[in-house]
């Protein structure tokens, strides 16, 4: 399931913050917010009693905007420029809790120049850290087969091959450099959405953003880093917004809680290992109707929480996590 993008000027409200604070109570010690964004989770943790919060974000703009209020918390809040995939290094010591919100923040969507949104015309960029290959580069350089694989595996777009062929045909006429260009190409390949349905370009934009930022590779590395950094009794709370991410997080926690993970029913079973996490609760937490009414962005969100045991950390069985067989998502950097 893919959530529609926020309407223009929608405020960024931390999703499922209350169940995180309630389930992980009492909030004490040192926490790391690996997707700092507008700082909603970090502030919530500090107000709930965390002694210290380390806010990590790879987007320079997020940290720049936080400068206006971060000083109010003194040395209780430390901001770090970087990706949460290396959160153990950013932490500089053991942690009592880690929070990851895997959605794109509203302040990124609201800025047309960042190129994340099909609702606003801007350069086709989509880079969180603002370096490396952009979405425009990817659209210009990859062949139709690779583009189709990206759209299908990372966006679950059923019309992936039709859209990929349309992109290749369009770029032969003129470079695709604007979000509006790409949105129009995608929309031309699909039926007009019914009222209440997501924009036709939602899945394609999601897929390109994930590919540009290697989001699934970073997610797996971040989950492993969190496992290694957390103290026994520490909490890992992960908020996802689409089924691909949620499947990976679910299977990671299944493995780490002592269950044998399998990539599919035909794969050989693996032996159970000592539980490194206890799931609290065992199933994902969905937002309440009241939260969705107050914050439509929360509609597709799912929260999974695990509590670290004293068992030694170990790498995840990546073949069993459900990672798409695409790019280098299963590779260790």
Swiss-Prot record:
What does the entry list as the binding residues for S-adenosyl-L-methionine?
A: 39-41, 57, 84, 101, 108
Per UniProt, the keywords (alphabetical) are: Cytoplasm, Methyltransferase, rRNA processing, S-adenosyl-L-methionine, Transferase
Catalytic activity, reaction form: cytidine(1402) in 16S rRNA + S-adenosyl-L-methionine = N(4)-methylcytidine(1402) in 16S rRNA + S-adenosyl-L-homocysteine + H(+)
User: What is a single molecular function from GO for this protein?
Assistant: rRNA (cytosine-N4-)-methyltransferase activity
EC primary class: transferase
Taken from the record, one Pfam family name reads Methyltransf_5
Q: Which domain of life is it from?
A: Bacteria
> Where in the cell?
Cytoplasm
| Gene3D superfamilies referenced in this protein's UniProt entry, alphabetically | Putative methyltransferase TM0872, insert domain (1.10.150.170), Vaccinia Virus protein VP39 (3.40.50.150)
Q: What is its EC number?
A: 2.1.1.199
Gene Ontology biological process terms from the UniProt entry: rRNA base methylation
Instruction: Provide one Gene Ontology cellular component.
Output: cytoplasm
Stretches assigned to coiled coil: none
CDD domains annotated for this entry? AdoMet_MTases (cd02440)
Q: Which NCBIfam families match?
A: 16S rRNA (cytosine(1402)-N(4))-methyltransferase RsmH (TIGR00006)
HAMAP family in the record, alphabetically? 16SrRNA_methyltr_H
Q: What does this protein do?
A: Specifically methylates the N4 position of cytidine in position 1402 (C1402) of 16S rRNA.
Similarity-based family:
Belongs to the methyltransferase superfamily. RsmH family.
Which protein is depicted? Ribosomal RNA small subunit methyltransferase H
């Amino acid at each position: 399931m893919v959530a529609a993008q926020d309407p223009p000027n929608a405020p960024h409200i931390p999703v499922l913050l209350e169940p995180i604070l309630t389930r992980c109570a009492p909030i004490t010690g040192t926490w790391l917010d690996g997707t700092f964004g507008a700082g909603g989770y970090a502030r919530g943790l500090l107000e709930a009693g965390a002694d210290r919060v380390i806010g990590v974000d790879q987007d320079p703009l997020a940290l720049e905007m936080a400068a206006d209020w971060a000083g109010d918390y003194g040395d209780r809040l430390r901001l770090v420029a970087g990706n949460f995939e290396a959160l153990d290094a950013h932490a500089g010591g053991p942690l009592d809790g880690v929070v990851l919100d895997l959605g794109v923040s509203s302040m990124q969507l609201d800025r047309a120049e960042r190129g994340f949104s099909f609702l606003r015309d801007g350069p086709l960029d989509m880079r969180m850290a603002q370096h490396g290959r952009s979405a425009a580069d990817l659209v210009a350089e990859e062949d139709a087969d690779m583009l189709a694989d990206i759209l299908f595996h990372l966006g679950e777009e059923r019309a992936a091959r039709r859209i990929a062929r349309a992109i290749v045909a369009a770029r032969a006429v003129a470079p695709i450099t604007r979000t509006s260009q790409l949105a129009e190409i995608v929309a031309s390949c699909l039926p007009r959405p019914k009222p209440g349905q997501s924009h036709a370009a939602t899945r394609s934009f999601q897929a390109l953003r994930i590919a540009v930022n290697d989001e699934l590779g970073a997610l797996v590395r971040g989950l492993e880093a969190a496992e290694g950094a957390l103290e026994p009794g520490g909490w890992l709370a992960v908020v996802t917004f689409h089924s691909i991410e949620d499947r990976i997080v679910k299977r990671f926690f299944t493995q780490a809680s002592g269950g044998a993970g399998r990539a599919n029913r035909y794969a050989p079973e693996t032996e159970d290992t000592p539980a490194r996490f206890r799931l609290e609760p065992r199933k994902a937490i969905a937002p309440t109707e009241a939260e969705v009414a107050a914050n439509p962005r929360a509609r597709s969100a799912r929260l999974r929480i695990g509590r670290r045991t004293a068992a030694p950390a170990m790498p995840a069985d990546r073949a069993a996590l459900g990672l798409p067989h695409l790019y280098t998502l299963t590779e260790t950097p």
